[in-house]
Amino acid sequence: MLASISPFGERARASRWWLTTTAYVLSSALGGTLVGLLSALLGAAVPERWRWSPAGVGLAAALLVLGLLLDARVGGSRLPSWRRQVDEAWIGRYRGWVVGAGFGAQLGVGVVTIVTSSTTYAVLVLAALGGTPWVGALLGLVFGLVRALPLVGMVGVHDREALWAVLRRVELGAPAAEVVARVGLLAGASALAWTALGGVA
């Protein structure tokens, strides 16, 4: 998808890249906000004294650790996920802004397409643990915006050479991004475990 929606590709389809990308970013942010809000509302259905009990916080920490193990495919395990991705047949069939809005919303929600990292599930777990609608919405908003960043990075891609250069940079940066995600999950799991154990107490 990243290779398909670029100034170079959109120009060939007589579409405006900035409009497609704006629709993509806004709908990804909205999708993330909605799923974060929904997770927080579901979490709020559980009494706070249970959510923030040592058992509740410990369960959240365990889920983050489980996500790390699944990401690493320990014992041949795999992260549970849908087997579907956004429908690239939309490109060329619909107007650019429709494609941008449709793709952005699906990727912003995160769990309706292929889930490649447990960080997606971690956002839902943390939003539910908080149980506060505005915090959940904010977590989801940040998630949706971060998901949209790679497409924004296509700005300035006006020929094949520039497109391949960006794709090479993305490929080269993927291992570092994976490490950052795993460190973040580990830090979050450690903080939750510390809280569940009562800190220094």
Region spans (language model):
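Alpha-helical multi-pass membrane helix bundles of inner-membrane/thylakoid proteins
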Residues: R49-A60, L64-V112, D159-A177
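Transmembrane-helix boundary and interhelical-loop signature of multi-pass inner-membrane proteins
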Residues: L38-G56, L126-A127, L149-A181, W194-T195
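Short alpha-helical packing/oligomerization segments
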Residues: G131-V152
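Transmembrane helix boundary and interhelical junction motifs in multipass membrane proteins
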Residues: M1-S4, V111-V123
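Juxtamembrane boundary at the C-terminal end of a transmembrane helix
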Residues: A189-A201
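Juxtamembrane transmembrane-helix termini in multi-pass membrane transport proteins
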Residues: M1-L34
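Interfacial segments of multi-pass membrane proteins
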Residues: I5-A14, W18, T120-V135
